[in-house]
Amino acid sequence: MDYGLIGKKLGHSFSAPIHEELGGYRYQLRELPDETALAEFLRKREFKAINVTIPYKQAVMPACAYLDPAAKAIGAVNTIVNRNGVLSGYNTDYAGARRAMRRGGVELAGRVVLILGTGGTRRTFSAIARDEGAREILVAGRSGGDGVLTYGEAARRADVQVVLNASPAGMWPHNGECLVDLSVWPALESVFDAVYNPLETRLLWQAKQRGLPAVNGLAMLVGQAKYASEHFTGRSIPDEEIDRVHRTLLGRLANLVLVGMPGCGKTRIGRLAAQALGRDFVDMDAEIEKAAGMSIPDIFSREGEQGFRDRETRVAEILGARTGLVIATGGGAVLRGENVRALRQNGVIVYMQRSLDQLAVGGNRPLSSSREALEKMLAARAPLYEAAAHRVVFNTGGPPSLARRDVLAAFRQALDAGVL
């Protein structure tokens, strides 16, 4: 390959579309199972330039005849350029992460900064915190020792103001994993998570619940790719390209998730929105029926509402971990907080309101069999829809194209506002 990424496991990587967007060259992923395979790859040198990800950012350093100052200071290389068989190593993670933190409102100067994780990214974050003028830099790991706190010890530091996650905790396919409970730090001001898949980890979700700046690693990824691409090609790329590519990629990855009462038009408008966006449409209730091998009324009859809700949660977790979908939820999907968290991790949630007179009664809907049942349901669920949603639109019952327009506008506005 000419350009690409090497690492042990790359199924989570978004690097190819980023580099192809930034540099206009083909970018390939090459998984190397161990350091023996890494050594053979470096020996052959059959590449022009590559990026390096975990766990090889330190292992590649001896092969580099030149190391830039950032790589030397941090002790990690994420970019290698092959110039006539001579390898030069660079660290562009530093510049990418520092820019992402600054633009995301993560202020380090004069703060007590806690870094989660003890791998290579920790060195990058430590260097940034130091250069930004942090008052104190703490590092926490699972085992502690040698200047590293355990997570339990870190929890007792009530003065922590900024948390930087340098670990892979919460990264796909381990969605939902989280190392800490942010509620133990009353002075907390902001959180940065190097993880970008999913876009909203449980760590970031906690921060957003407190109204704090919460930044994922996607802007860092695009930023370091921009600086790496400059080394690859020798061409200067304006910093504005980082923001453009970040917006483009986010628009492709983010799910559009529709919530609302039964009969509000989620399925019909969702299909139209999916067609307009050129992406797949998924109806959660249909997925539940497919997995169960029976209809929703039959599930309620045989397993009760509890059984149905358990199935719904499993489907929400599966779909929420995917990207680039339009998802129509069942009317009761918001009844469980874990469903909302699962759907928000990669999704913009839009609440579709509709007047009570226009909502459907009966049919394939066991819990809305009458007007009275529907009124009670709306009173109970409306606050949950509002709390779950990033945006609200009203479906007037007019031409479906108008509702589709409003839903798509809400989706784009939410992304522009930085909800993910």
PLM regions: where:
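Phosphate/diphosphate ligand-binding glycine-rich loop within oxidoreductases
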Residues: D2-G104, P198-E200, L204-Q206, R210-P213, ...
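Glycine-rich adenosine-cofactor-binding loop
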Residues: G7, G89-Y94, M101, V106, ...
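Adenosine-phosphate binding glycine-rich loop
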Residues: E31, A194-A254, T396
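NAD(P)-binding Rossmann-fold cofactor-contacting core
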Residues: E132-V148, D285-E287, A291-A292
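Rossmann-like adenosine-cofactor binding region
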Residues: G147-V215, A333-N339
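NTP-dependent small-molecule kinase module
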Residues: D243-G251, L272, A276, V348, ...
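ATP-dependent small-molecule kinase phosphotransfer cores
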Residues: A286-R344
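A glycine- and Lys/Arg-enriched "phosphate-lid" helix/loop adjacent to the NTP-binding pocket
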Residues: Q345-L384
